[in-house]
Amino acid sequence: MGRLFGTDGVRGVANRELTAELALALGAAAARQLASGSAPGRRVAVIGRDPRASGEMLEAAVIAGLTSQGVDALRVGVLPTPAVAYLTGAYDADFGVMISASHNPMPDNGIKIFGPGGHKLDDGTEDRIEALVGDAGPRPVGAGIGRVIDAEDAADRYLRHLSKASTLRLDGLTVVVDCAHGAASAVAPRAYRAAGARVIAINADPNGLNINDNCGSTHLDSLRAAVVAHRADLGLAHDGDADRCLAVDADGNLVDGDHIMVVLALAMREAGELASDTLVTTVMSNLGLHLAMRSAGITVRTTGVGDRYVVEELRAGDFSLGGEQSGHIVMPALGSTGDGIVTGLRLMTRMAQTGSPLSDLASAMQTLPQVLINVTVADKATAATAPSVQTAVGQAAAELGDTGRILLRPSGTEPMIRVMVEAPEKDIAQRLATRVAEAVSAAR
């Protein structure tokens, strides 16, 4: 069996790859690894979930694993992933667990684990947890068994935390927020209204089955239409667990994570809040971001794909802003992981501060045409390293020279290779990406 942990926890189709038995074993293993060195007294883990149908089943299984190892489960209910990360620190818990598959379709689910303070685990800690899966070890009895506690104040605590993200009132701004029928549904509209914005919420009625269904950050058509119809100043789209945020301007044009990072980096540098005048992003960020930051005198640090690697670089360099093109934006002063609602509040704060429409702010970066093709493969390692694929990549890179770039990346959560090409013209990017994707497909 391959490694359980991917780039963002353990994922799979609920009740197929991600079974209740596996969830119980992961809960027990996490308890043994992360709570073993705790100070004397009750050991506590925060646990939350998004609203997809399988969440309650997996939550019950994880709780069984936690409590079987003597760890109390502090249940916060349906809340965003960044809320669980924040509350892990706020409640001074030993660790936290979030049950969500983020932007993935409803049949999928996942288990993310946060260490003390709400930080994502490093690879070594994940490996040690994985080694304990299926090895229950000694189990407590009687009063030593963990208890289940409902955290009634969890949502209010998180909302108070969110209020720190907006440093001035947002009165006069109208925003459409797409909650993806996910974990943001109950809290994002409240947070934006509390900051003063006029809020029109769409796709905010989760029933367990409709999460991410033609809505949210991966399907922007309904958001674009609503922004134009309501003559809103902007639209914000969250995914199923609200750890990411994408935006559209008043005309419905996409403002992706790269543009959001540029807007926030310039704002933070102006305020003296951009530590070391440095932005941290991943290899997937558009070359246009690098050019915009270079012209502004801002250094860009690049990491592998995944917000956990962005966070690791932020912590290592004591930097203050990082993120991904997909809309995971991390500001350590406001949270230990990406928070889509914090991002939305900061973006609107910049609009209110400058009086500028989002389209003007986003124009600080010019996007180079980019083509991304996902190729399903049986073996990611074999397909990516096949000689025919390497030849195709080399030929494409030679043709681009320094006018663009090509990136071949195995997905961390799905059986596919992502082929990304940026070029001066869209047709060039499409032609080269298609050529490389065909080579990958033939080698799979």
UniProtKB/Swiss-Prot annotation:
Gene3D superfamilies: Alpha-D-Glucose-1,6-Bisphosphate, subunit A, domain 3, Alpha-D-phosphohexomutase, C-terminal domain. Its cofactor is Mg(2+). InterPro entries: A-D-PHexomutase_a/b/a-I, A-D-PHexomutase_a/b/a-I/II/III, A-D-PHexomutase_a/b/a-II, A-D-PHexomutase_a/b/a-III, A-D-PHexomutase_C, A-D-PHexomutase_C_sf, A-D-PHexomutase_CS, Alpha-D-phosphohexomutase_SF. Keywords: Isomerase, Magnesium, Metal-binding, Phosphoprotein. It comes from the Bacteria. The keyword Repressor does not apply. GO terms for molecular function: magnesium ion binding; phosphoglucosamine mutase activity; phosphomannomutase activity. Activated by phosphorylation. The modification Phosphoserine is found at S102. SUPFAM superfamilies: Phosphoglucomutase, C-terminal domain, Phosphoglucomutase, first 3 domains. The active site is at S102 (phosphoserine intermediate). Binds 1 Mg(2+) ion per subunit. Pfam families: PGM_PMM_I (PF02878), PGM_PMM_II (PF02879), PGM_PMM_III (PF02880), PGM_PMM_IV (PF00408). Mg(2+) binds at S102, D239, D241, D243. GO terms for cellular component: cytosol. It is an enzyme of class 5 (isomerase). It catalyses: alpha-D-glucosamine 1-phosphate = D-glucosamine 6-phosphate. Its EC number is 5.4.2.10. GO terms for biological process: carbohydrate metabolic process; peptidoglycan biosynthetic process; UDP-N-acetylglucosamine biosynthetic process. Belongs to the phosphohexose mutase family. Catalyzes the conversion of glucosamine-6-phosphate to glucosamine-1-phosphate. PANTHER family: PHOSPHOGLUCOMUTASE (ALPHA-D-GLUCOSE-1,6-BISPHOSPHATE-DEPENDENT), PHOSPHOHEXOSE MUTASE. This is Phosphoglucosamine mutase. It comes from Mycolicibacterium paratuberculosis (strain ATCC BAA-968 / K-10). The gene is glmM.
